[in-house]
């Protein structure tokens, strides 16, 4: 526990941190990578280049300083980060490195005096212990469960299938022929990629897209125009190739009782965690109403359309509505899609007709912000709204 003086000193630095902004974490990462370039094998350098990771870390530091007297308020954030850390194989020995360069950054940017540096060192130590303990639990759980493993395991690509012009799916089976760890629908896999074209090892997280089956995993990857790893996966990796995988992780997953109505809302590749949820609801013969709402540019980039249609034909409690922003001439209204333009939920009165309904959504950030506002405007309780950000987390 932190003493009152330490807490007071840390809280007194909040205005300084806020005024500095992500410049703080930019300096931190530059310093840490200079002294420990091997950590570039862990961190997503694309997120470093875009500034997303710097912003996410800055927000986390400010949230910790603000809630330092009430760490319980940070537990959801701790869980989300711990899940990601274990997908990246973060170990206890990494925390002193981060702490050293965080304190050095504060000193170099602000020269706040030894009392402030000591207070932040204590505060960081407490937070590091929280993460180390939780991550140890996650590692141990995934190692001891049926089909589980602790860090990395070799998987063979047994099926590669083009699902749209930009999305490709990969079915993965353990090279050792054993079972695979159960996962919660909505969680992701960490994929470790080493290739002659890459300067460093790259790690990416991709959502699982089927119901758990104990034998294989399926992920789907969107080919981004400037995406180093996504283009490599699409163009270079083929059936028979081996990839190393961390166990399923993630704090975004389907968690409802059999009588709970569910709305699954997505845009683009954001449908991938929803697809796992839909397949699971179907396999479990979920009795309550399920709504599938999806937005895509057009049929050329609408992945898994046939799979969802096949489920809808066998699942009478599933309602499906698809929006195409700019349909092609070959896209059939009423068959391939139901509405043209952007997804608009304002006229869907059923959204709020059942106080038990839970809402899960994923997609590009502007889409999620728009959907979040629409749900809240219809009086949906925030605790029944669940969302996933691909990449560093953002509050919508």
UniProtKB/Swiss-Prot annotation:
Cofactor info, note text: Binds 1 heme b (iron(II)-protoporphyrin IX) group per subunit. Binds 1 FAD per subunit.
Site (Involved in heme-bound ligand stabilization and O-O bond activation): 29
Domain FAD-binding FR-type: 150-255
Binding of heme b, residues: 85
GO cellular component: cytoplasm
Catalytic activity reported: 2 nitric oxide + NADPH + 2 O2 = 2 nitrate + NADP(+) + H(+); 2 nitric oxide + NADH + 2 O2 = 2 nitrate + NAD(+) + H(+)
SUPFAM superfamilies: Ferredoxin reductase-like, C-terminal NADP-linked domain, Globin-like, Riboflavin synthase domain-like
Similarity annotation: Belongs to the globin family. Two-domain flavohemoproteins subfamily.
Protein name: Flavohemoprotein
Naturally occurring in which organism (per UniProt): Yersinia pestis
Top-level taxonomy: Bacteria, Pseudomonadati, Pseudomonadota, Gammaproteobacteria, Enterobacterales
């Amino acid at each position: 526990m932190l003493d009152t003086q330490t807490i007071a000193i840390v809280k007194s630095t909040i205005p300084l941190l806020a005024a500095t902004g992500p410049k703080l974490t930019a300096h931190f990462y530059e310093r840490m990578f200079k002294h420990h370039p091997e950590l570039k094998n862990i961190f997503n350098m694309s997120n470093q280049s875009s500034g997303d990771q710097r912003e996410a870390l800055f927000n986390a530091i400010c949230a910790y300083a603000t809630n330092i007297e009430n760490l319980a308020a940070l537990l959801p954030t701790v869980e989300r980060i711990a899940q990601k850390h274990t997908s990246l194989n973060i170990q206890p020995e990494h925390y002193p490195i981060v702490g050293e360069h965080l304190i050095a950054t504060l000193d170099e940017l602000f020269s706040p005096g030894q009392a402030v540096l000591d207070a932040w060192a204590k505060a960081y130590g407490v937070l590091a212990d929280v993460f180390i303990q939780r991550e140890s639990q996650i590692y141990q759980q995934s190692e001891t469960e049926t089909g589980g493993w602790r860090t990395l395991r070799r998987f063979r690509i047994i099926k590669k299938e083009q699902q749209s012009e930009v999305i490709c799916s990969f079915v993965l089976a353990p090279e050792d022929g054993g079972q695979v760890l159960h996962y919660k629908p909505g969680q992701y896999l960490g994929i470790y990629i080493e290739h002659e074209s890459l300067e460093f090892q790259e790690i990416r997280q991709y959502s699982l897209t089927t119901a758990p089956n104990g034998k294989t995993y399926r992920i789907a990857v969107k080919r981004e125009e400037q995406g180093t790893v996504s283009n490599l996966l699409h163009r270079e990796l083929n059936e028979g190739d081996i990839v190393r995988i961390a166990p399923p992780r993630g704090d975004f997953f389907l968690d409802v009782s059999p009588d709970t109505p569910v709305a699954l809302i997505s845009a683009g590749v954001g449908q991938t965690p929803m697809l796992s949820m839909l397949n699971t609801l179907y396999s479990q013969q979920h009795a309550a109403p399920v709504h599938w709402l999806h937005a895509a540019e057009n049929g050329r980039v609408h992945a898994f359309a046939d799979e969802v249609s096949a489920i809808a034909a066998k699942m009478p409690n599933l309602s499906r509505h698809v929006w195409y922003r700019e349909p092609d001439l070959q896209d059939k209204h009423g068959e391939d899609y139901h509405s043209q333009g952007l997804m608009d939920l304002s006229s869907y009165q059923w959204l709020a007709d059942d106080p038990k309904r839970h809402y899960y959504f994923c997609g590009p950030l502007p889409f999620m912000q728009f959907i979040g506002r629409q749900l809240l405007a219809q009086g949906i309780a925030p605790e029944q709204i669940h969302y996933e950000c691909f990449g560093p987390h953002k509050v919508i």
